[in-house]
Curated annotation (Swiss-Prot):
The keyword Transport is assigned to this record: no
Keywords linked to the UniProt accession: Cytoplasm, Elongation factor, GTP-binding, Hydrolase, Magnesium, Metal-binding, Nucleotide-binding, Protein biosynthesis
Assembly: Monomer.
Residue ranges of every copy of the tr-type G domain listed in the record: 10-209
Annotated region (G5), positions in chain: 174-176
Region (G2): 60-64
Subcellular location: Cytoplasm
Name the UniProt record assigns to this protein: Elongation factor Tu
Binding locations of GTP: 19-26, 81-85, 136-139
Region (G3): 81-84
Region of interest (G1), residue spans: 19-26
Organism from which the protein derives: Herpetosiphon aurantiacus (Herpetosiphon giganteus)
Renumbered residue ranges of the record's region G4: 136-139
Length: 400
């Protein structure tokens, strides 16, 4: 069957659900697709379809990231359902890095939990520009004063981590109520909170200014072989435009730079003439084997970015209370540096006269990675150790 062409008639926004495990992120995602489907603006995706990798079902927690799409009157949304479990925060980082805005899901009976804090902190680190809160399971709360208290606590928490806590819309509702409703009338009360939430997302999360005019760059998230067609890499275009036929370079995870041409671009299984900044696309590459490319590399306009191993870094080291280290580290410390879509081990050098770094410190250091990756001034990264984030940083200067 011939593929449909993707219609670009509304602004496109990448959004995602974040929050503590079992607070209702996946239920809400399903409820949004259901409510929008009743208005003819989405395909309904059931809970099981979103929570769909094999290991997820067995343990009842979302591990991988699911993509759904829906529309409101004003916009087209690509929605990622981000993992909520602390062990899988690494995936959370890959998801949060792809967001123009986030829906923070908080269970009203439970209030903010450790992962709620960690996700707000991470959203700040990876610079999610705006957030809307869905206060879920309010049907399980009888006391309106308790609801007010949970809301106040949330606003304080958001403010603490650098978000405008007083301004952020908090929508109260029940995702399960909407998902379980037998009614096919979208104006019924059980769908009201979902409509309100989408209105808040439409109004409060700004349409991002896409970096369309900058040179093309796309971090590679995944690589597939398609029989008879070649190798496809997927990811979200960080900046610029890629057109079918463009020559591009594959950079990172080693010193060599490969040159290839893009022979096809797809989004949501539909063909595009070009992919633009902010689009989640698959790009078909000419003459490239499945083994020639890997997650962590980038596709880029020739000459626009180079692989580097050594740079200066301005780093904030998380406190113990924020989920960071309990003890200091010293020169020669070798954590993982989470750059764009992958972890790379690197050694840290501290400035002269600084013997150790304490949790909570802000410090400038030098970093030397064990393999070159595509790095440029202003690049943000996370520092991770044993599966948890211990710091966040930015590259003010490249050394080598």
């Amino acid at each position: 069957m011939a593929k449909q062409k993707f219609e670009r008639n509304k602004p496109h926004i990448n959004i995602g659900t974040i929050g503590h495990v079992d607070h209702g992120k996946t239920t809400l995602t399903a409820a949004i697709t259901k409510t929008m489907a009743l208005r003819g603006r989405a395909e309904f995706r059931a809970f099981d379809q979103i929570d769909n990798a094999p290991e997820e079902r067995a343990r009842g927690i979302t591990i991988s990231i699911s993509h759904v799409e829906y529309e409101t009157e004003n916009r087209h949304y690509a929605h990622v359902d981000c993992p909520g479990h602390a062990d899988y925060i690494k995936n959370m980082i890959t998801g949060a890095a792809q967001m123009d805005g986030a829906i923070l899901v908080v269970s009203a009976p439970d209030g903010p939990m450790p992962q709620t804090r960690e996700h707000i902190l991470l959203a700040g680190q990876v610079e999610v520009p705006a957030m809307v809160v869905f206060l879920n399971k309010v049907d399980m709360m009888d006391d309106p004063e308790l609801l007010e208290l949970v809301e106040m606590e949330l606003r304080e928490l958001l403010t603490k981590y650098g978000f405008p806590g007083d301004e952020i819309p908090i929508v109260r509702g029940s995702a399960k109520g909407a998902l379980d409703s037998a009614s096919t009338d979208a104006s019924q009360p059980e769908y009201q909170s979902i409509q309100e939430l989408m209105q808040a997302v439409d109004d409060y999360i700004p349409t991002p200014e896409r970096a369309i005019d900058k040179p093309f760059l796309m971090p590679i998230e995944d690589v597939f072989s398609i029989k008879g067609r070649g190798t496809v890499v997927t990811g979200r275009i960080e900046r610029g435009i890629v057109k079918v036929g463009d020559t591009i370079e594959i950079i990172g995870m080693g010193p060599d730079v490969r040159t290839t041409a893009v022979t096809g671009v797809e989004m949501f299984k539909k063909l595009l003439d070009e992919g633009r900044a902010g689009d989640n696309v698959g790009a078909l590459l000419r003459g490239i084997e499945r083994t020639d490319v890997e997650r962590g590399q980038v596709l880029a306009k020739p000459g626009s970015i180079k692989p580097h191993t050594k740079f200066k870094a301005e780093v904030y080291v998380l406190k113990k209370e924020e989920g960071g280290r309990h003890s200091p580290f010293f020169s020669g410390y070798r954590p993982q540096f989470y750059v764009r879509t992958t972890d790379v081990t690197g050694a840290i050098g501290l400035p002269e006269g600084v013997e150790m770094v304490m949790p909570g410190d802000n410090i400038q250091m030098t970093v030397e990675l064990i393999v070159p990756v595509a790095i440029e001034q202003g690049l943000k990264f996370a520092i991770r150790e044993g599966g948890r984030t211990v710091g966040a940083g930015i590259v003010p200067e490249i050394i080598a």
